[in-house]
Curated annotation (Swiss-Prot):
The chain crosses the membrane at residues 12-32, 47-67, 73-93. GO terms for cellular component: plasma membrane. The keyword Transmembrane helix applies. Gene3D superfamilies: 3.30.70.120. It comes from Methanoculleus marisnigri (strain ATCC 35101 / DSM 1498 / JR1). Coiled coil: none annotated. Keywords: Cell membrane, Membrane, Transmembrane, Transmembrane helix. It is found in: Cell membrane. Pfam families: DUF2179, DUF5698. It is a multi-pass membrane protein. InterPro entries: DUF2179, DUF5698, N-reg_PII/ATP_PRibTrfase_C, UPF0316. Belongs to the UPF0316 family. This is UPF0316 protein Memar_1511.
Amino acid sequence: MLGVVPDIDPEFFSLVVVPVFIFLARICDVTIGTMRIIFVSRGMKVIAPLLGFFEIFIWIVAVGQIFQNLTNPLNYFAYAAGFATGNYIGMLVEERLAMGLALIRIITQRDATNLIDYLRAAGYGVTVLDAHGKQGPGKVIFSVVKRKNMRDVEDAIHEFNPKAFYSVEDIRRAAEGTFPVTVPGPTPFSFGRVIRRGK
């Protein structure tokens, strides 16, 4: 008859439903925790505490289910597996969001004129210093870029100076700066795309 919810077998609930719930809850709270740490490092004082509230709330619910079902070893496995999976998903989300700024330092061993011209034409602020390394003269190129634009800069390095050494450092705060023009992307995770100019 419609509207009647069948009783769930207690053994099935204990052995299947509870471990699955714990697994999913751990994924959620660890993913939120990863994002909270990122927002704290970015100095976002409003979002970070809010995420912290939901993180600890979900964690308490998950731990409460374990204490109510201490005899089921699947709960412990689900707890650990959810923690590991949550870390992985959190890193994927962080990479997708690509929030904040990064300092990229490029050291070239040959002429870097084309790379420098491309970066400046694309709208990136570039500072160039003369350098001298083991294999002779070169250039050290500094640029502060939005993390969502890092792929564009790395592609340019691989195209114009494929053997150049470069390193990337996160920046918590920066004043002024020159960045490429962006337009809104089609999805919430796009956060704009770089308008690449022709070479």
